[in-house]
Amino acid sequence: MTSQFASLWQQSLEILKQELKPASFDTWLKNTQLVTIQNGEAHIGVPNDLARDWLENRYATLVKNALSVVLGESVEVRFFTPSADSRRSEPSRRPVATEESSPPLLNPKYTFDTFVVGNSNRFAHAAALAVAEAPAKAYNPLFVYGGVGLGKTHLMQAIGHFVIEQHPQSRVVYVSSEKFTNELINAIRDDKTVEFRNRYRNIDVLLIDDIQFLAGKERTQEEFFHTFNALHESSKQIIISSDRPPKEIPTLEDRLRSRFEWGLITDINPPDLETRIAILRKKAILENLDVPNEVMVFIANIIQSNIRELEGALNRVIAYANLSGKSLTSEVAEEALKNIIPSHRAKVITIALIQEIVAEHYNMRVEDFKAKKRTRDVAFPRQIAMYLSREMLDVSLPKIGEEFGGRDHTTVIHAHEKITKDIEKDPQLEMTIQVLKEKIQRA
């Protein structure tokens, strides 16, 4: 390692020290080195295969971000064991990991403290917290499903962190169904199925991610069925995640499906605008980023699919601003995201857009919202438009009032309170509000 690479790596390690617990840093990163950087890829030497696999699976993004900050440009990372590279072509017979040989693969950032709760995930969060506080006594199993990047893994691992923090002697295992399958295949090949079963049946909490990948794998389903039974009969907690509910997983054995339904099934939906903004704010706070509110609102309006893409967009905007030497503004954010924003992308939601959609729905003119008319056929839609402006936008009450003919902020408060109460009493109005929100988001 040249002195230049040594210096770059030392600076990167200083950043990583702030991100990780001392024990994690000392175990996985202390004895690593930056060997070279070629074609935008940093080659990082690690002491053994276990460290390489651990870093690749759990800390690659953290290391990449730290090194990119030091270099001032984006870089990919590759971990390798120098002594192993020369024998890479030889077949490897790795032992099946045991609970003593490796701790649970939990991302240090995935805790309840960093999980942003909103309408889309409130029930799932409450269920996860209940399970964490009383393993095997609240809901067992807990089955969490939802689309990609919505926080299922975060919530699962938060349970693991909480249990370990409250009960340090607890044996917690987190594994993806793909890794479970691969370990089973290796165990059968190496005649180590006893060790494999000990690994997964002599534990207190099992967190298994993406269970839908067991579909069609009869031997793996058979093994997991017996693992599930062994744990459940011993009053051990099982938490499962999937991209769909049990009944919709194809070629899943009925006996497994029925067991997944023994406990509680809860879903996580895409976050609404308010939650997306809150997620970006939380990320900015946790990473000490100075991001103007207008930029976060812009990104939250553009990226509506999932949290992973939302946070990725913020990273892209910040990197673009830093590398181009520009200040963070919504205009710069639009420049940074121009390649990932569809040409037919939705308009940025504004008060004017909300007024336009509501006016069209009630067959009236936008100008009527700003007029002094107080008849119900005008006042009620106006109140709905004010309500939606308050719910869907992060703007001040005076600003909303100003856009509705210079009305006082107390008028906006009254409108919001009235519509909120009306929704509670009128299911039809609740449905109308939801339809209007969807129209606005698709506009």
Swiss-Prot record:
One of its GO terms (biological process) is regulation of DNA replication. Keywords: ATP-binding, Cytoplasm, DNA replication, DNA-binding, Lipid-binding, Nucleotide-binding. Residues 85-97 have a biased composition (Basic and acidic residues). Disulfide bonds: none annotated. Residues 322-443 are annotated as: Domain IV, binds dsDNA. InterPro entries: AAA+_ATPase, Chromosome_initiator_DnaA, Chromosome_initiator_DnaA-like, Chromosome_initiator_DnaA_CS, DnaA_C, DnaA_dom, DnaA_N_dom, DnaA_N_sf. It comes from the Bacteria. ATP binds at G149, G151, K152, T153. GO terms for molecular function: ATP binding; ATP hydrolysis activity; DNA replication origin binding; lipid binding. Residues 105-321 are annotated as: Domain III, AAA+ region. Residues 1-80 are annotated as: Domain I, interacts with DnaA modulators. Pfam families: Bac_DnaA, Bac_DnaA_C, DnaA_N. Residues 80-104 are annotated as: Domain II. GO terms for cellular component: cytoplasm; plasma membrane. Residues 83-105 are annotated as: Disordered. It is found in: Cytoplasm. Belongs to the DnaA family. Domain I is involved in oligomerization and binding regulators, domain II is flexibile and of varying length in different bacteria, domain III forms the AAA+ region, while domain IV binds dsDNA. Plays an essential role in the initiation and regulation of chromosomal replication. ATP-DnaA binds to the origin of replication (oriC) to initiate formation of the DNA replication initiation complex once per cell cycle. Binds the DnaA box (a 9 base pair repeat at the origin) and separates the double-stranded (ds)DNA. Forms a right-handed helical filament on oriC DNA; dsDNA binds to the exterior of the filament while single-stranded (ss)DNA is stabiized in the filament's interior. This is Chromosomal replication initiator protein DnaA.
